[in-house]
């Protein structure tokens, strides 16, 4: 069965959210423990080849959660709405997709809606 056409559906804005302060390559071990003594050599090689200079973590250095997945999604939605110049009251449907949310129940979309 063919999919129905999406006439009149357009992407008019996108949003992004980066949790916390950027963590550079020298600070990674403060957030992610090394696997073993030899892992630092492998880490240096991977970091040199992948070109990534900094990243963002939703957890703090001691492993505490600073930003839930639902909160990060809600912040990205807010950025998207701002970019589109609309309010959440003007949105008819919220669809989400994730490989794993913060909890099994309620569903991730409900969690994001609650954050909004």
Regions found by a protein language model. Name each.
Residues 17, 97-102:
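Acidic, glycine-rich active-site loops and adjacent beta-strand->loop/helix elements
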Residues 100-113:
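Short Gly/Thr/Asp-enriched flexible loops that form oxyanion-binding sites at enzyme active sites
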Residues 1-93, 114-116:
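Conserved "HGTGT" condensation-loop signature of ketosynthase/thiolase-family condensing enzymes
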């Amino acid at each position: 069965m063919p999919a129905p056409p999406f006439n009149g559906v357009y992407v008019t804005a996108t949003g992004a959210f980066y949790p916390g302060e950027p963590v550079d390559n020298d600070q990674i071990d403060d957030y992610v423990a090394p696997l073993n003594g030899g892992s630092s050599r492998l880490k240096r090689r991977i970091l040199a080849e992948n070109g990534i200079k900094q990243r963002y973590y939703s957890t703090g250095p001691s492993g505490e959660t600073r930003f839930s997945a639902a909160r990060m999604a809600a912040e990205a939605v807010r950025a998207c709405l701002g970019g589109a110049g609309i309010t959440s009251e003007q949105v008819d449907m919220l669809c989400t997709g994730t490989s794993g949310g913060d909890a099994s129940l309620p569903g991730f979309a409900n969690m994001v809606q609650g954050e909004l």
